[in-house]
Amino acid sequence: MKTIISLVGCIEEEVVGNFLKETDDILEEYCEYLDQLEMIKPEFVKPFPRITIEISSAGGDVHYGSAILDRIEEMQMLGIKVDTTARGLCYSMAFIIYLMGEERYAGRWTTFMNHASSSRQVGYLEDIKNNVAFLEMMDDKFDELILEKTKMTRERLNQAKLKCDWIGYEEAIELGIINIFDDMEDNEEDEEMPF
C-alpha cells in the first residue's frame, strides 16, 4: 500500500482528483484492515501504517483545497494517522493543508506563507458581494484552524490579511507550525571524529 501521497504544484482540479483517488485506495485498504482485525488475536495486531502527505506547493483554489481538508479529516476520524511534510514551499492553501498533519515535518530550506483569500471575481455587484462574504467566512475557518494548530496569534493573522506573512524554517518551529524536527545543535557532540 502506498503510504506517501504527493501534493505538488497548484492545488487545482487535477491535483485534487489524484489526491482523492490515492486516498480512496488507502480507505479501501483501511476497510480491509478493519475486517481482518476481527480474525486476529489482539496481541498479533499491527497498527495501520501512518500516511504522509508531502507538500511542495504555492497554494491554489480554496474549493479544491477544502476537498483535500475534508478527506484528511475523514481519514483522521476513521483512525488513520495522517502526517504532513513540506518540501521547499508551502504557501497559501498548501499551508492550511499542511497544518492538518498530526506530525508536521519540513526540510530546512522550506518556507511557509499565509495570507488572506483573494479573488478575481467579476460580474454583477451582488455576486461580488456574495463572493467577498464567502471568502471572509473561509478565512475565519482557516484562522481558527491556524490558532488551534499553532502558536500564531490572532494579531499576526490579522496582519496577514493585509500582506503575505512569510515564515522561515526556524520561525516555523518556534510558532509550532513544524512540530517534529531534528535539533542539529543538540545532536552535535564535542567528541573528535574517528577518522
Spans of model-derived segments:
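Terminal-region recognition feature
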Residues: M1-F195
